[in-house]
Amino acid sequence: MGISTVTDQNWHIVRYSAEEKERWDRFVRRSKNGTFLMQRDYMDYHADRFQDCSLMIFCNRKLTALLPGNLSGNCFYSHQGLTYGGMLLSPSITLQQVESVFHAALDYLQKECSVQSIVYRAIPHIYHRYPAEEDLYVLTRLGATLVARSISSVIPLDDRLPFRTLRRRQLKKALASSLT
């Protein structure tokens, strides 16, 4: 296992290491808000560009949350090699546990990694398996400052968008010009 710290009698944090890959990936697949971006094969594609500082957070020896991240100087990013990279949560986690997870992670990052600031990019809720915005609530309660907001859009595959007349005209022009 990686560097480990006991934050209190219930919470235990382990810094990710390669021997934890299978456990990490299994948790991502069953978490309420993980996506393929958080699978280690995807994250490790840029391993040479970022100093990984991903955290595995345990409650009573049970993996409860993951925090993909990297260090740059004294700043923790969730994660610069990913489009987004917020806290991945167990489907059974409670709001009180999420608060404890954040407090434990902040304590760990300050004490073990000398982190002075955090840049947190939440996982857009449209990608969640189960609604999960506890992280945003807790960050607000902790006094976090919003510095940027990104937009995420989806197209429901089972509800096709109408084909507009203007698009049809442009398509005919493209075909007539041998542009395909």
Write out the residue ranges for each language-model feature:
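Acidic-and-aromatic substrate-binding clefts and catalytic sites of carbohydrate-active enzymes
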Residues: I126-Y130
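Conserved GNAT acetyl-CoA-binding A-motif
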Residues: C113-P124
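A residue-level signal for conserved active-site and pocket-lining positions in enzyme catalytic cores
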Residues: W24, Y120, A174
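Conserved alpha/beta cores of soluble small-molecule-handling proteins
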Residues: L109, V115, G143-A144
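Short Pro/Gly-enriched beta-strand edge/turn motifs at strand-loop
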Residues: G34-D41
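Conserved donor-binding loop and adjoining core beta-sheet/short helix segment
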Residues: H12, R26-R29, D41-L109
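Structured loops at beta-to-helix junctions and adjacent beta-edge loops in soluble globular domains
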Residues: Y16, N70, S90, I123, ...
